[in-house]
From Swiss-Prot:
Keywords annotated in UniProt: Membrane, Transmembrane, Transmembrane helix
Claim: Membrane is one of the keywords in the record: yes
PANTHER family registered for this protein in UniProt: TRANSMEMBRANE PROTEIN 42
Stretches that traverse the bilayer: 37-57, 59-79, 100-120, 124-144
Primary localization class, coarse: membrane
Organism: Pongo abelii
Descriptive protein name: Transmembrane protein 42
Organism domain of life: Eukaryota
Cellular component GO terms held in the UniProt record: membrane
Tagged with keyword Ribonucleoprotein: no
Subcellular location(s) per record: Membrane
Membrane topology (UniProt): Multi-pass membrane protein
Amino acid sequence: MAERPGPPGGAVSATAYPDTPAEFPPHLQAGAMRRRFWGVFNCLCAGSFGALAAASAKLAFGSEVSMGLCVLGIIVMASTNSLMWTFFSRGLSFSMSSAIASVTVTFSNILSSAFLGYVLYGECQEVLWWGGVFLILCGLTLIHRKLPPTWKPLPHKQQ
């Protein structure tokens, strides 16, 4: 059987194999959007459970807390911390990169901490704090954004 000639530079092109269907890019393959959704969902849950663990630790180790509330806070902190790590590891397995998962968990943790701080302790955040949250959100959208690939032609060798 004769071998088909390849393109210059040793790269494989789709025209060399006309019977083989072209594959979709990874972000358009079947189930990729579902995996991305579950990755983001698990990371958002991990951030929320992390904030809940921190809030329960603050309740448990407060200065005016009874012994029963302290024990309950430690139990809630340990269980929500283990749930946070479970959801984070699941989010890592579903995500396309660990950077996306880490930034998503961080953003979710910050917003959940602000919400729980307001509900449980009456804390209000300053404008500078919300500016930092906005910058984190901008970074998150830049990381999640999929830019089209830029293909550079291979330089031809001069003989």
